């Protein structure tokens, strides 16, 4: 029987790129809490002893950006110079400009050529769902995130006190080529930053027994499953001291782990007038409801936009041969049941709220948090009825 391998990865909240994402989204949330219609594109760079805040912000909100950045870094766990990055001791620079008026006139309702709220930029976005996991996410990315959440949990509650904030996980999964179903887990890679005193064998055993095995389905772990734990043998220097971190550099971790295409636009630090974020969330909402409705077991949707224009310039759907109805009919149903204009997306998903900090680590999709309206399946019954199933 033929098989194939597929791999996805996740990173912890202490990974330098994720530190940057979380600072950017904390800034966004602090602004939206006061000014829901603010325009925000908040970028962050973190390096040894340094946090740089830059981008474009137009708002009436009064926010202490430096305080927000420090509090976010401290919450993640970088609160000591021993870790190479200290929330209280690092220098924080603020370099925000206002949004270009040329862009603003295309986004503001009643201005520009299209009097509806136009898209904040051109671009293409994808959404995806499948029936491999309870939250309708691909297996490898779903469980990679769970491994990283487990690492964080054991670090913060003190059960493994030698853990430090920076970590990465990677899963290689074996699929049955005929059924497309997961057969077993081939390889688990987990690298975690640690205190210098911990011995390698103790660390390896603790990671396998206390992080990996409680998370991964035991029936998919076999005698042949390979465990690669801190493969270099040492991971003491990490976080922003080990690597420079930038907002928007973990876009595959943020989405589907490579199981679906990505349009290229990052999420964190962007208010929902930016379709890079809001339309990608809407696409996930559409795809998840199609799968939840039983109209397909796998669904990928692409939409595209032009700056200043409200209606999408294209909508396409691929169900990879699993659809119960034609893809043309699915597109018709999507147009009937989902408003994919920028303002429609914001209203449909209630996006003008300070809800984004939680999304900035462990994936924007596949986590059924109360704030994550794009993970609801409240359109599934209507879609199924309209499809005649």
Curated annotation (Swiss-Prot):
Its cofactor is Mg(2+); K(+). ATP binds at residues 15, 166-168, 234-235, 243, 249-250, 266, 270. Binds 2 divalent ions per subunit. Residues 99-109 are annotated as: Flexible loop. Pathway: Amino-acid biosynthesis; S-adenosyl-L-methionine biosynthesis; S-adenosyl-L-methionine from L-methionine: step 1/1. L-methionine binds at residues 56, 99, 243, 274. The keyword DNA-binding does not apply. The keyword Metal-binding applies. GO terms for biological process: one-carbon metabolic process; S-adenosylmethionine biosynthetic process. It catalyses: L-methionine + ATP + H2O = S-adenosyl-L-methionine + phosphate + diphosphate. Gene3D superfamilies: 3.30.300.10. Catalyzes the formation of S-adenosylmethionine (AdoMet) from methionine and ATP. The overall synthetic reaction is composed of two sequential steps, AdoMet formation and the subsequent tripolyphosphate hydrolysis which occurs prior to release of AdoMet from the enzyme. Belongs to the AdoMet synthase family. This is S-adenosylmethionine synthase. It comes from Neisseria meningitidis serogroup C (strain 053442).
